[in-house]
């Protein structure tokens, strides 16, 4: 029988209820638990409040309550260099990046995992809603958690086997209401604390104002696909493919249908818009993805297989056929049915039933072998 007291687990504690309950459960299971708070950004919000200071206070209270040591580590340099610069580069190129995935890949499960191992940890534990399973060959698989509504496998989709085999997800068989109930019964100070939203570590700021601090916006024309000017945009980086809100365009004599972003012309600094949800310019039958990573290891040879996919968070899975190219770690992904608003810069995440296979970054979308003018 395994003696859990000889197994050290470093828990990434954010000050939120999920990571706090993760630490509590591991402590109750007898592990040697160490709580660590990561500071990855200057968290002064739009009201001038340093949210990181408040969060760390909650970490200290929870750690004292459950009886574990705690530390704080600063990864602002790593976050700036590996995540934020990528974030700005993608927006500058007209794409819509997902910094949360890069944050997990480069900071939480890389720099932080290395730090945990330096503390002689056997495992790193996080409060994500995800599940791991080890097969008879000792290979770790990423699975969907019990709480499908909180499933975060999408954001973990570019981790490697080396990373996930050292990670524990204590909430994998719990729902969010169950987590809050455990926190309340244990008397944790943050049992009713609201979930954090917004960009990874940047929080709930006014996004347009925040982005303009780092990338000067250049306004330009909103045009229809045939070139008719119908409005003015505040900067291409503020808009994403399929967006309806915030365009400021009304009905026309021809149609009362709402307007949607259907493309961007970077050379002309034009935002391409069209009326109607079902614009054919929004539908793709294929995408190309790069940087493909599979949890169980990348195939060494070209391969073709059926799967389901997400290309945005909380999207229902769609059926696809994947043609993976081993030498370049790229994939051509063919949709069973045309897919709407496939957005370059976002993540492609592949599933086989309950298993998350891995994913990559969307480079381009196509319809009838013609590249869509999305960026």
Curated annotation (Swiss-Prot):
The keyword RNA-binding applies. ATP binds at residues 12-19, 38, 127. PANTHER family: MITOCHONDRIAL TRNA-SPECIFIC 2-THIOURIDYLASE 1, TRNA 5-METHYLAMINOMETHYL-2-THIOURIDYLATE -METHYLTRANSFERASE. SUPFAM superfamilies: Adenine nucleotide alpha hydrolases-like (SSF52402). Residues 98-100 are annotated as: Interaction with target base in tRNA. The active site is at residues 103, 200. Keywords: ATP-binding, Cytoplasm, Disulfide bond, Nucleotide-binding, RNA-binding, Transferase, tRNA processing, tRNA-binding. Residues 150-152, 312-313 are annotated as: Interaction with tRNA. One of its GO terms (molecular function) is tRNA-uridine 2-sulfurtransferase activity. One of its GO terms (biological process) is tRNA wobble position uridine thiolation. Its EC number is 2.8.1.13. It is found in: Cytoplasm. The record marks 128, 346 as: Interaction with tRNA. Belongs to the MnmA/TRMU family. Disulfide bonds join 103-200. Its main location: cytoplasm. This is tRNA-specific 2-thiouridylase MnmA. HAMAP family: tRNA_thiouridyl_MnmA.
